[in-house]
Each structure stands twice: as C-alpha cells, then as structure tokens.
Amino acid sequence: MKNKFAENIAQLRKEQGLTQKELAEKLGVITRTVSHWETGGQECSLDMLIKIACFFSVTTDELLGIE
C-alpha cells in the first residue's frame, strides 16, 4: 500500500519549488524529518499535520489522500 501522505507532501513541496531543507526551516523541523515523511519512514504528529496542511493551503484530508 502506498503512503499517500508521503507522496502528497513531496509533490506539494516540489510544486512550491522548495527543497527539503527550505520546507524544514519553514516548519521548524530538521531536514531529515522532512525526508523521512517523504519516504514514509516517519509519521508526523496531528499538530504538525495541521501545520503542514495550513502551510500548503490544503485540508488534512487532501494531505492524507482521503477522498
């Protein structure tokens, strides 16, 4: 099963023209954390999920790939 969150965060970051480092700085995390999210190696907290959704102006459902 594919991790839609991992796919979506990577796609949104690339659409915004951001590097993993730049996104990490904007969200207040380290670059490795963003990398782990994008590879499905780490989940984020609910608070961070909301912060990411707000940053990209999407819903948490969209970020998680829930239809």
What are these regions (language model features)?
Residues 14, 25, 54:
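Alpha-helical residues within the helix-turn-helix
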Residues 1-15:
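A short, Lys/Arg-rich alpha-helix, primarily the initiator
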Residues 28-43:
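Recognition helix of helix-turn-helix/homeodomain-like DNA-binding domains
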Residues 47-62:
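DNA major-groove recognition helix of helix-turn-helix/homeodomain DNA-binding modules
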Residues 9, 23-24, 34-37, 63:
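Conserved hydrophobic/aromatic packing and binding residues within compact polymer-binding modules
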